[in-house]
Amino acid sequence: MLMKRHLNTCYRLVWNHITGAFVVASELARARGKRGGVAVALSLAAVTSLPVLAADIVVHPGETVNGGTLVNHDNQFVSGTADGVTVSTGLELGPDSDENTGGQWINAGGTGRNTTVTANGRQIVQAGGTASDTVIRDGGGQSLNGLAVNTTLDNRGEQWVHGGGKAAGTIINQDGYQTIKHGGLATGTIVNTGAEGGPESENVSSGQMVGGTAESTTINKNGRQVIWSSGMARDTLIYAGGDQTVHGEAHNTRLEGGNQYVHNGGTATETLINRDGWQVIKEGGTAAHTTINQKGKLQVNAGGKASDVTQNTGGALVTSSAATVTGTNRLGAFSVVAGKADNVVLENGGRLDVLSGHTATNTRVDDGGTLDVRNGGAATTVSMGNGGVLLADSGAAVSGTRSDGTAFRIGGGQADALMLEKGSSFTLNAGDTATDTTVNGGLFTARGGSLAGTTTLNNGATLTLSGKTVNNDTLTIHEGDALLQGGALTGNGRVEKSGSGTLTVSNTTLIQKTVNLNEGTLTLNDSTVTTDVIAQRGTALKLTGSTVLNGAIDPTNVTLTSGATWNIPDNATVQSVVDDLSHAGQIHFTSTRTGKFVPATLKVKNLNGQNGTISLRVRPDMAQNN
């Protein structure tokens, strides 16, 4: 239909149910907030109360329309300028569906300014059209083949950038969603949503999805950018709490506390990892020219590859001998290739896992670094610094120097001169021997085997027994608190407790020649202990839970809680002498002798009875002899 155009006039096509045809109705364009007159045809339609189907509004080149609302499948075709329009129709059939009708159409040469797109609303920006300062919220959407500048996506607001389309300066707020399709471009996007469920949570309904190109994106806390296999992102800045998932290409990413995950088939180049940033290269993923700065972390999983890495002082490398990593660190060139690691530096959260059949040479383990050598793996020329962590068992082969310069070795079922710092762990397998082991806050697990020389537990140390372990030498505890738990420790050795703090023996069967309590406190909890406790005054011995002590005590302060038992035998090496006895359990005098009766005695300086019992147990034949 040919329509005449007058100055400052636009036209509506209205379906007339009486005539069965469209009626052309004119409406003066709005200016300065004043509404123009509405054609009589519109008024007649309202008066008849007949249903009115979709109407089309045409804004011609050179014309400007201010305000107005589009509803009920209305269309506004903008070849001029539309300012301040509210769009609430066009998406009734679902996001970005070709079956939708209605909405605002920005044609080539047309401009839409300050548009608000609400629930079920759709703004379509055609090639050559421009939309600026658009707010899309509550499930509304914007479809781009043209240009959109400074769009804001709120509360399920969506933006679809098609091939040839460009979005500049989009802000994606909570539950907003931007999709960049193949051939589309988004620049300067700010992403504030998509990662609320945590790192790499299964969340594909918000954030930025890149199948085309994204440039100069900023990802803030809770923000997420997902790069599809067809997508590419350049110059991305990721802050703490934000992350980037890469199935395609990511170039020149800067991690300022944020995370980057490179998946199978994905590629990341020129990534800069600053403090608290974290780049993860998964199996099949590839990274090149990554730089790790102080407190940054690069993690390369088994099957992942990172080349030309620059690891600066204080940067962390986390990998295994099943990955491929090459680069430089403060020692020079390093590599992890084909199951062989060389010249690796581990610090500040760095870690190297040496798998069975693989090797590592010249590994430096400093504060916060961890070297984990699995059963069947080998690490030679290891240099342990203060705060370095070693994880190994007696089935591995490890040799090097401790932080104090002493040489240590694990191999052939024998461990010599190990020093386990806080976080370190060593497992002694059945039939193997550990000699002169020092545990400084680490964990020593014995699954049988033997302790030889002097085994030292310092503050924070734990010795866990599984099965029966033999100690024929000395187990000594120095300053601080330590724990001996589980299993059984047998043999003709002795336990020496010195320094302040508490040694707790829990759920353990302890059979030793003697226990020397020189300083501090010895707590026996739910354990069976067969030995004499030779103590110094001022120390304390506590029997708790269901503990049974078979042996004499001389002299110390003793506490028996309800359920604990102290059996005083007549063959003890010393008489039992107690300074302060707090007694709520059971004390029994027992005899293992035959022949003439030999009395046993208990001397107590101060007794605090708490419904405990003291009883004699003698053999009837002994009673008859006396």
PLM regions: where:
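Beta-strand-rich solenoid/repeat architectures in extracellular/passenger domains
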Residues: L70, T86-E99, T116-T118, R137, ...
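Fold-core signature of tandem repeat domains
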Residues: V65, Q76-V78, A82-V87, Q104-I106, ...
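Short, intrinsically disordered N-terminal pre-domain segments
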Residues: L2-K4, D56-V59
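Residue-level structural signal for beta-strand termini and adjacent loop
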Residues: L28, R137, Y239, R330, ...
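Short N-terminal segments immediately surrounding and downstream of signal-peptide cleavage
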Residues: I57-D74
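Sec/Tat signal peptide C-region and signal peptidase I cleavage site
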Residues: L50-D56
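Bacterial Sec-dependent N-terminal signal peptides
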Residues: M1-S43, V47
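Extracellular beta-strand/loop-rich repeat segments of large surface/secreted proteins
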Residues: N472-A482, T490-T514, D526-N626
